[in-house]
UniProtKB/Swiss-Prot annotation:
UniProt keyword list: ATP synthesis, Cell membrane, Hydrogen ion transport, Ion transport, Membrane, Transport
Protein's name in the database: A-type ATP synthase subunit E
Self-association and partners: Has multiple subunits with at least A(3), B(3), C, D, E, F, H, I and proteolipid K(x).
Annotated family: Belongs to the V-ATPase E subunit family.
Species this chain originates from: Aeropyrum pernix (strain ATCC 700893 / DSM 11879 / JCM 9820 / NBRC 100138 / K1)
Pfam families: vATP-synt_E (PF01991)
GO biological process: proton motive force-driven plasma membrane ATP synthesis
Subcellular location: Cell membrane
C-alpha cells in the first residue's frame, strides 16, 4: 500500500485548485462574452429603434408639412373667394349708385348724345330702335329728338345699367351700354379694386 506523505487537504487543494481556477476563468470569459453580446445586441436594437423613430418623426414632419401646405392653400383659396365676393358686391353697389345718380350727370347726357350721334352718322340715319335702361327712356327720347331722330323706337330693357344698344335698319346692333364697358374692363377693375382694398 502506498503511503501518502504531507497534508492531504493541501494536496486536495493543490490538485483541485488549478482545474477550479481554469473553470472560473472560463466562466468569467463566458460571462464577459455574454455581456459583450448583450451589449452589442442592445446597441444594435437601440440603433434600429432610433432609426425607426427618426423615420417616423420624419414621416410625421412630412405629413405635417403636407397638411400645413394644404391648409395654407385652403386659406388662400378661401381668402381669394371672399375677396372676389367682396369685389363683386362693391362693383354691384357702384353700378347701383351710378344708376341712381346718372340722370343728373351732365357727362352722362353728353355720352348719350355722342354715341347716338355717332351711330346715326355712321349708319346714314338708319337707326331703327334704341334699347336703354327704364330710367333712361325719357332722356334717350330727348337726345333722339335733339338729333332729329324723333321716329326711332325706344325700348326700356331691365338689366341695362346705362348707355344704349342701337339697332340699325339693316339688323346690325351697336352696343354702347355700361354693361358692355364693364364686361370688357371687369378683369382690370377687379385687380384695381383688390389692390386698393387689400394691398394698401
Amino acid at each position: 500500500m502506498a503511503k501518502v506523505q504531507g497534508d492531504p487537504r493541501r494536496f486536495a487543494d493543490t490538485v483541485l485548485e488549478k482545474p477550479f481556477k481554469e473553470a472560473l476563468a472560463r466562466v468569467e470569459e463566458a460571462r464577459e462574452a455574454g455581456l459583450k453580446l448583450v451589449e452589442e445586441a442592445y446597441k444594435s436594437a437601440l440603433s434600429a429603434a432610433r432609426k425607426r423613430l427618426e423615420s417616423r418623426v420624419e414621416e410625421a414632419r412630412e405629413r405635417l408639412q403636407g397638411l400645413k401646405s394644404k391648409a395654407d392653400l385652403e386659406v388662400r383659396t378661401e381668402a381669394e373667394r371672399v375677396k372676389d365676393e367682396l369685389v363683386s358686391r362693391l362693383i354691384e353697389e357702384a353700378l347701383a349708385e351710378f344708376r341712381r345718380r346718372k340722370a343728373g350727370m351732365e357727362s352722362y347726357r353728353q355720352y348719350l348724345e355722342r354715341v347716338l350721334g355717332s351711330a346715326a352718322g355712321e349708319s346714314g340715319g338708319s337707326v331703327a330702335k334704341v334699347l336703354c335702361a327704364p330710367e333712361d327712356e325719357e332722356i334717350v327720347r330727348e337726345v333722339l329728338g335733339k338729333l332729329g331722330l324723333d321716329g326711332v323706337s325706344v325700348e326700356a330693357v331691365e338689366g341695362i345699367y346705362g348707355g344704349v344698344v342701337v339697332e340699325l335698319a339693316e339688323g346690325a346692333r351697336l352696343d354702347y351700354t355700361v354693361n358692355n364697358i364693364i364686361a370688357a374692363e371687369e378683369p382690370r377693375l377687379r385687380r384695381a379694386v383688390k389692390r386698393a382694398l387689400f394691398e394698401a
